[in-house]
Amino acid sequence: GNRYVTGYITGLLVRLSLLTDRALPEEVAVMKAKAFDYLNEEALKEYRAIRKAEKNGTKITTLSDATMEYMYLVALGSVKLSGEYAKMFDYFLTKLGRNLVNGTMICKAQTAIILQKQGRRTEANEFIASIKEHLVQTDEMGAHFAFHANPYTWGMMPVPAHVAVMEALREAGGNDALIEEMKLWLLKQKQTTSWNSPVATAD
């Protein structure tokens, strides 16, 4: 399997059950469980490599995009971890603080959701506040990121970043009006941009 592709598909399955508020059909639920088994093992490999590097004196301050995606999926899917997986996840949690300064919008949104699901609301709200600092609002375009004109310098794709932030704001609560404004920007993108990749459409 491929960690990125498996993570992407798992994300769709997790969101699907959340959006429909229904349990997944049995065969799909089995597929999701197998996907998490694979992602757990891949994350564990990375965790062991990090711990080994630290023992050898390397300072690890941030996590890979794949590990951030994994933590986000575990949080969003309310996956229960035990044993070494739980220990690994707790360790990863200690590395999230640096994302406040260095993280892309997707990374900050994911971190906010992870912390929210861990009951660490105060820390999650710091990330939400940081995200809001970058949002601009106009009557015509709604709420959006000013740097969308040149997003790749920010290491992000505009639509997935926008959607990830909406998800984080929804999870934090009390942002309904802002989310509606962000929907307006998305609708404008749909009108002016051809979403010809399945990834953009799915997001």
Protein language model annotation of sequence segments:
Residues 1-203:
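Large, well-folded core regions of big proteins
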